[in-house]
Amino acid sequence: AFAGILADADITAALAACKAEGSFKHGEFFTKIGLKGKSAADIKKVFGIIDQDKSDFVEEDELKLFLQNFSAGARALTDAETATFLKAGDSDGDGKIGVEEFAAMVKG
């Protein structure tokens, strides 16, 4: 799904780094997968993949399963990790993350 945007080796390394429950840190993950240095267009493409229901927002249930977008066998985020991730990205307080909020969080 991320071919041409992200390198498989970077994704594998990023997933390995947050295998343990409670170890997911979105900023570190975005850096490790190589997303931080990507263009706005590439970040928007990644957002489109993560936005499973195509609502133009990433909601809490989609964040919980965030890692599984990168590998089907990846773990779900814990409730605490999901809440922290949502709070970090939801700058307008509407309970979901839009594409601009996502881009700002990635560039963080």
Curated annotation (Swiss-Prot):
Record keywords: Acetylation, Allergen, Calcium, Metal-binding, Muscle protein, Repeat
UniProt binding sites for Ca(2+) 2: 90, 92, 94, 96, 101
Gene3D superfamilies attached to this UniProt entry: EF-hand
Superkingdom per UniProt: Eukaryota
Residues modified as N-acetylalanine: 1
Positions of the EF-hand domain: 38-73, 77-108
Chain residues that bind Ca(2+) 1: 51, 53, 55, 57, 59, 62
TM helices/strands, residue ranges: none
Pfam families linked: EF-hand_7
Signal peptide: none
GO MF terms, alphabetically ordered: calcium ion binding
Entry keyword annotation includes Nuclease: no
GO CC, one annotated term: cytoplasm
Miscellaneous section: This is the major hake parvalbumin. This parvalbumin has an isoelectric point of 4.36.
PANTHER family, alphabetized: PARVALBUMIN (PTHR11653:SF12), PARVALBUMIN ALPHA (PTHR11653)
Family, as annotated: Belongs to the parvalbumin family.
Functional note: In muscle, parvalbumin is thought to be involved in relaxation after contraction. It binds two calcium ions.
Protein name: Parvalbumin beta
